[in-house]
UniProtKB/Swiss-Prot annotation:
It comes from Nitrosomonas eutropha (strain DSM 101675 / C91 / Nm57). The gene is tgt. Its EC number is 2.4.2.29. This is Queuine tRNA-ribosyltransferase. Keywords: Glycosyltransferase, Metal-binding, Queuosine biosynthesis, Transferase, tRNA processing, Zinc. Binds 1 zinc ion per subunit.
Length: 361
């Protein structure tokens, strides 16, 4: 892995990340393909939209279809016919989401498979083994996602466990030529975030992610922790904000020096008939669009906006036609990729602050 910073505008950074399967221009947004597919879209469509890297999920791919299937194809890239870089989450957040169905110990996490009820045991070593089979360009350490809200002692215990798991992840990753990213935890406590960063830095990683945000905390709390944490991450390594977020969240995070993002919002909201546009969010189920013959966004040149009207998309949403979800997803991911392109251009021109002010209205 090679990360090169080209320029910056205050804290906002413009760079290039070179990985085994290609190059990524940063700041970058990664569409989420949890099960090895971005819902409803083909790899060719994703490339046409401008996506350079996508995210897969270790936990879900391990359970279904299973490693033997992916290994038979020679890795996740061939299995899903995507020849660009792939980042895989370690499974820590998904285990956290199981709630009472899982039992955490020093060794790892024991839980019942949500697929068939089998007892499963996921450890840092097993997560690294799975991601090696997947041949992920960016491997994430196995960590515990600190819940919200929790008191400081619980958050500290969780952060310390994640640091011990980070050491084990690093040791188990040895011999894998792909990149390994550490994940900063510590809940809503700045001092714990500081100690997490110091511990991860001492272990040494190819990049650093901020985890444990967008887990139910108020927006102002997320911004407080982000603005405290991001500037402390190593300058010469890529910085990844996990699971965030809205277009506004992304612009604010770029202001803090974040380079990489992922979020399910553009595709999930597309399936629910919410489109991101230059004029704000358009909610297609609203009856006001039944006779609206204008495109979803007058300022967008995506396939959906060039060929279809709001009235047609309203009709598809109301009737539950799967084409509606596809067309909406094409538009929303195009919107996100164009946003990242505009952000990169603004940083290059030294105009990012002005861009951010215009964007926030």
């Amino acid at each position: 892995m090679k990360f090169q910073l080209h320029c910056h505008d205050h804290h906002a950074r413009r760079g290039t990340l070179t990985l085994a399967h290609g190059m990524i221009e940063t700041p970058a947004f990664m569409p989420v393909g949890t099960y090895g597919a971005v819902k409803g879209l083909s790899p060719d469509e994703l490339q046409t939209l401008g996506a350079e890297i996508i995210l897969g999920n270790t936990f879900h791919l391990w359970l279904r279809p299973g490693l033997e299937v992916i290994e038979a194809h020679g890795g996740l890239h061939r299995f899903m016919h995507w020849d660009g870089p792939i980042l895989t989450d370690s499974g820590g957040f998904q285990v956290f989401s199981l709630g009472a169905l899982r039992k955490i110990s020093e060794e790892g996490v024991r839980f019942r498979s949500p697929v068939n009820g089998d007892t499963c045991f996921l450890t840092p070593e097993e997560s690294m083994r799975i991601q090696r089979v997947l041949n992920s360009d960016i491997v994430m350490i196995f960590d515990e996602c600190t819940p919200y809200p929790v008191d400081m002692q619980i958050a500290e215990d969780s952060m310390q466990l994640s640091l011990r798991w980070a050491e084990r992840s690093k040791a188990a990753h040895a011999g894998n030529p792909n990149a390994l990213f550490g994940i900063v935890q510590g809940g809503m406590y700045e001092s714990l975030r500081d100690r997490s960063i110091a511990g991860l830095y001492n272990i040494g990683f190819d990049g650093y992610a901020i985890g444990g945000l967008s887990v139910g905390e108020p927006k102002l709390e997320m911004q407080r922790i982000l603005s405290h944490t991001a500037p402390q991450l190593p300058v010469d390594k890529p910085r990844y904000l996990m699971g965030v977020g809205t277009p506004e969240d992304i612009v604010r995070a770029v202001e803090q020096g974040i380079d990489m993002f992922d979020c399910v919002l553009p595709t999930r909201n597309a399936r629910n008939g919410w489109l991101y546009t230059s004029q704000g969010v358009l909610k297609l189920r609203n009856s006001r669009y039944r006779l609206d013959t204008s495109p979803p966004d007058e300022n967008c040149d995506c396939y959906t906006c060039r060929h279809f009207t709001r009235a047609y998309l309203h009709h598809l949403q109301r009737t539950g036609e799967m084409l509606g979800a596809r067309l909406n997803s094409l538009h929303n991911l195009h919107y996100y990729q164009r946003l990242m392109s505009d952000i990169r251009k603004a940083i290059e021109a030294g105009q990012f602050e002005q861009f951010a002010c215009r964007f926030s209205g």
